[in-house]
Amino acid sequence: MEQTYQYGWIIPFLPLPVPMLIGLGLLLFPTATKSLRRMWAFQSVLLLSIVMIFSMNLSIQQINSSSVYQYVWSWIINNDFSLEFGYLIDPLTSIMSILITTVGIMVLSYSDNYMSHDHGYLRFFAYMSFFSTSMLGLVTSSNLIQIYIFWELVGMCSYLLIGFWFTRPLAANACQKAFVTNRVGDFGLLLGILGIYWITGSFEFRDLFQIFNSLISNNEVNFLFVTFCALLLFTGAIAKSAQFPLHVWLPDAMEGPTPISALIHAATMVAAGIFLIARLLPLFIVIPHIMNFISLIGIITLFLGATLALAQKDIKRGLAYSTMSQLGYMVLALGMGSYRSALFHLITHAYSKALLFLGSGSVIHSMETLVGYSPQKSQNMGLMGGLTKHVPITKTAFLLGTLSLCGIPPLACFWSKDEILNDSWLYSPIFAIIAWSTAGLTAFYMCRIYLLSFEGHLNAHFQNYSGKKNTPLSSIYIWGKEASEISKKNFCELILLKMKRTECPSFFSKKGCKLDEKVRNMIQPFLSISYLGNNKTYFYPYESDNTMLFPILILGLFTLFIGFLGIPSNHEGVDLDILSKWLTPSINLLHQNTNTSLDLYEFSKDSIFSVSIASLGIFIAFFLYKPVYSSFQILDLINLFVKRGPKRIFSDKIKKGIYDWSSNRAYIDPFYTTFLTVGMRKLAELTHFFDRRIIDGIPNGVGLMIFFVAEGIKSLGGGRISSYLFFYLSHLSFFLLIYYFLNF
């Protein structure tokens, strides 16, 4: 077994040759390298698969033996300072390694087709492989110095991937925003690392925790300084995991390609912050004020993220705020000391969110042939709807991820989220009420995203994409916006776009659909987009290719079954809770009791309330977002409640307030823009003025003064040597007299 652990160093380094070789190939042999691009993609997936198999082998050994292995090499050794590099294989490392590799393989396989027509295909795979390498290096690090090095590499990769389409101004601004926001957290992390080294004299986790706990228990260190250093360490996690108030970069990060969003939100960028808190939890747990602060940030973030997701029109931004909220649950759990619950939710959320993002990518991919390649249109849920009949596999997978995130049993997130909710009652009733209320909001906005995207009729048919700013036949109701009425006649004519299968073959068929001349004239300005130069014109979205659907289906299976990893179950004295056995060494390090989990019956009984709240959120979403065009009738159930009156006006005000809150991002971004961005620019202008006029002005002024004095003397001398000599001797005599009187 120890021989297997000795090769743990290959985990971060095995995927590294691919980005290096791609970079060298593009520099030295660009044409040949691009011609072999599918081979490089295969190599990326292959090497990451080897790491996944190796990580699974290590995990099985850890479950059976509850072992921890660390290997270090001494790099710098002297009397005052020593630095070691190595790797640490413990349950947290193996869990994160499996998470990164499995999600990474699915995303890379998906990206082969998704990015196939992009000129930056090879650059994309180089960035993605290096991203996985950096994250694997982070989770295997054995000390704080390595953590910081790979932490910065992860940030650099996210900057490159978010700004992958750097020619688009929005993408360029988004990657800069992510970079600058994370600079704040990274600077705090660096100061915290230096402060902890000042206290303990070590960067190694194995020594650091023992020394730190000993100093705290013996009261041999300034508690205020210790708390401040721990707070600085937590600042790094706040920025990386998009926690309040450094969450502003996350929705803008959606400007990158969708596979990047899936990897960032599931297993790399945002997971790095959760990993850091979990890794340093033995340090945080002995400082009660820090634990309380961590839980406070978590509860604020989970509620804020849920409210911001309520009225988003962009499908990816809605999922981004969902990620922010779910990360808040994990931070809350870690702040409460629920180590197992936090990691369990990290696992289940990763697969569910990767499924949702890849599903949204499939939807966006299919919508692009209708509305063009502008993200403002292809990602707009107001232009979707009615996709069930066109993308049934994607719809089923997306529904699976939606129900999982809503907390519906027996899907993955149900088991992990309910553990956090149950633990929150024991920690703080106020926090518990907020967390449970947010569970209902989660079910509402996730169901809203699903309904707007897949149910009803294709709303793109009701918009004019001819390039002229004509009034659309019907405005699309999302929230806070009124839909204009259309006549029943026009509506029925537009419904003819939904052609009978007996009259029209599939859009994959070579035969075109024969439409009535009147209908053809109506839809001509709407839909006239050919797909990638093909002579065939697509009038409807289409299902993605198998290379994109296969990863979605695999992630769907993970979403179905990964929750059974941590189900609390004790059958005839045999503990079937695999996750608890896996985490035994880490839980023992935290001095927590490993036998605190409920049995399956008690857990199911406690979960009734949370499932009821989630069901209520789903019901409200169905009630509010039931498709208006659900039949050939203009009136349906919701229209019975839309008559004008005092209650209607009041409800409109509430909806408008929620819409404004969500669309303006809780007014936090405008606040930062007004008081920070503008303030920093004014400060920069002030310092520039001080530097140019004061700092540079003093030596320049002295030089000018000397110049004018010299010019004056020159004019007095008249250009004659005798005059210059007279002035020289007279001034010399004057200074000699002064010197004489001062010394005698």
Curated annotation (Swiss-Prot):
Which residue ranges run through the membrane? 9-29, 40-60, 88-108, 125-145, 147-167, 185-205, 219-239, 258-278, 290-312, 327-347, 354-374, 396-416, 425-445, 548-568, 608-628, 724-744
Q: How does it sit in the membrane?
A: Multi-pass membrane protein
Q: Is NADP among the key words of this record?
A: yes
Any one Gene Ontology MF annotation carried by this entry is: quinone binding
From the UniProt record, list the reaction(s) this protein catalyses: a plastoquinone + NADH + (n+1) H(+)(in) = a plastoquinol + NAD(+) + n H(+)(out); a plastoquinone + NADPH + (n+1) H(+)(in) = a plastoquinol + NADP(+) + n H(+)(out)
Which keywords does UniProt give here? Answer: Chloroplast, Membrane, NAD, NADP, Plastid, Plastoquinone, Quinone, Thylakoid, Translocase, Transmembrane, Transmembrane helix, Transport
Record-linked InterPro entries: NADH_UbQ_OxRdtase_chlpt_su5_C (IPR002128), NADHpl_OxRdtase_5_subgr (IPR018393), ND/Mrp_TM (IPR001750), NU5C-like (IPR003945), Proton_antipo_N (IPR001516)
Q: Does the keyword Transcription regulation apply?
A: no
GO terms in the biological process aspect are:
ATP synthesis coupled electron transport; electron transport coupled proton transport
Q: Where does this chain mainly localize?
A: plastid
Look up the record and report any one GO term of the cellular component aspect. chloroplast thylakoid membrane
Q: Which family does it belong to?
A: Belongs to the complex I subunit 5 family.
User: Which NCBIfam families does the record cross-reference, listed alphabetically?
Assistant: NDH_I_L (TIGR01974), PRK06590.1 (NF005141)
Outline the subunit composition: NDH is composed of at least 16 different subunits, 5 of which are encoded in the nucleus.
Q: Which PANTHER family match?
A: NADH-UBIQUINONE OXIDOREDUCTASE CHAIN 5
Q: What is this protein called?
A: NAD(P)H-quinone oxidoreductase subunit 5, chloroplastic
From what organism does this protein derive? Dampiera diversifolia (Blue dampiera)
Query: What gene makes this protein?
Result: ndhF
